[in-house]
């Protein structure tokens, strides 16, 4: 059972993989780099309890189809205040399969080094997601199938409100990026985050929500 421990961020890192010296070293590196508490859990063993606020890093290199189905089912029944990130994900892992993961907040591919993982997790601790541009675009487009429970009362960041207001005047992603001096990939990531927060499926619904809830 996962003992409840918390970091200064209010989060706990749970690395789910096969026990090994390499896995232990990775966990220690992440704990030190992120100033976060953490625990290693054997991917082949069941997990009865996960503390609220947990950030779960699941090693896809050690997961066969049976284990993937087990963890998807187990994690889908857990507290909504958890975040799941896939580690060592095969480059050809289908987007539709990524979409099946509950509470998914990031995907690290097998070619990414530890520092990329650290940087991605730092973003997740700030409330961001970690996806490639193509994956973020796919998830935004298919957000109606994305199994993430959200509420309209979720607080939006200042940047998310700026982007929503740009949507209200019909701005494209490229136009939003140029006007806010950020990359188009960053715009798509912000869109994906705010779509989750306000529980909408597309830009039209986001604009409708903004018209009802935001001042210009």
Curated annotation (Swiss-Prot):
Signal peptide range in chain numbering: none
DNA-binding region: 173-192
Protein topology in the membrane: Peripheral membrane protein
PANTHER family per UniProt: DNA-BINDING TRANSCRIPTIONAL ACTIVATOR DEVR_DOSR (PTHR44688:SF16)
Function: The master regulator for adhesive curli fimbriae expression; necessary for transcription of the csgBAC/ymdA operon. Plays a positive role in biofilm formation. May have the capability to respond to starvation and/or high cell density by activating csgBA transcription. Low-level constitutive expression confers an adherent curli fimbriae-expressing phenotype, up-regulates 10 genes and down-regulates 14 others.
Compartments (UniProt record): Cell inner membrane
HTH luxR-type domain residues: 149-214
A GO-annotated cellular component: plasma membrane
Keyword Aminoacyl-tRNA synthetase on entry: no
Entries under PROSITE patterns matching the protein: HTH_LUXR_1, HTH_LUXR_2
Reported induction: Regulation is very complex. Strongly induced at 28 degrees Celsius (at protein level), transcription regulation requires c-di-GMP, although the mechanism is currently unknown. c-di-GMP levels are stimulated by the diguanylate cyclase DgcM and repressed by the c-di-GMP phosphodiesterase PdeR (YciR). Transcription directly repressed by MqsA, and indirectly repressed by MqsA via MqsA's repression of rpoS.
Pfam families per UniProt: GerE (PF00196), VpsT-like_REC (PF21155)
InterPro entries: CsgD-like_REC (IPR049151), Sig_transdc_resp-reg_C-effctor (IPR016032), Tscrpt_reg_LuxR_C (IPR000792), WH-like_DNA-bd_sf (IPR036388)
Effects seen without this gene: No curli production.
Protein name: CsgBAC operon transcriptional regulatory protein
GO BP terms, alphabetized: positive regulation of DNA-templated transcription initiation; regulation of single-species biofilm formation
The organism's place on the tree of life at top rank: Bacteria
SUPFAM superfamilies given in the database record: C-terminal effector domain of the bipartite response regulators
Keywords annotated in UniProt: Cell inner membrane, Cell membrane, DNA-binding, Membrane, Transcription, Transcription regulation
GO molecular function, one term: DNA-binding transcription repressor activity
């Amino acid at each position: 059972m996962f003992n409840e421990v918390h970091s200064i961020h209010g989060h706990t890192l749970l690395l789910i993989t096969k026990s090994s010296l390499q896995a232990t070293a990775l966990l220690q590196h992440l704990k030190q780099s992120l100033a976060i508490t953490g625990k290693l859990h054997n991917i082949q063993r069941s997990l009865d309890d996960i503390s609220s606020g947990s950030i779960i890093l699941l090693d896809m290199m050690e997961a066969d189809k049976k284990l993937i189905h087990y963890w998807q089912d187990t994690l889908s029944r857990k507290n909504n205040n958890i975040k799941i990130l896939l580690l060592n994900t095969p480059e050809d892992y289908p987007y539709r399969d990524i979409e099946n993961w509950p509470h998914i907040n990031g995907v690290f591919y097998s070619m990414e080094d530890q520092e990329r993982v650290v940087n991605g997790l730092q973003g997740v601790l700030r409330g961001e997601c970690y996806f490639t541009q193509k994956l973020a675009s796919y998830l935004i487009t298919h957000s109606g199938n994305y199994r993430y429970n959200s509420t309209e009362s979720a607080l939006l960041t200042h940047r998310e409100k700026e982007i929503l207001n740009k949507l209200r005047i019909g701005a494209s992603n490229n136009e939003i990026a140029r006007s806010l001096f950020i990359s188009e990939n960053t715009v798509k990531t912000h869109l994906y985050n705010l779509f989750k927060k306000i529980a909408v499926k597309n830009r039209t619904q986001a604009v409708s929500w903004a018209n009802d809830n935001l001042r210009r």
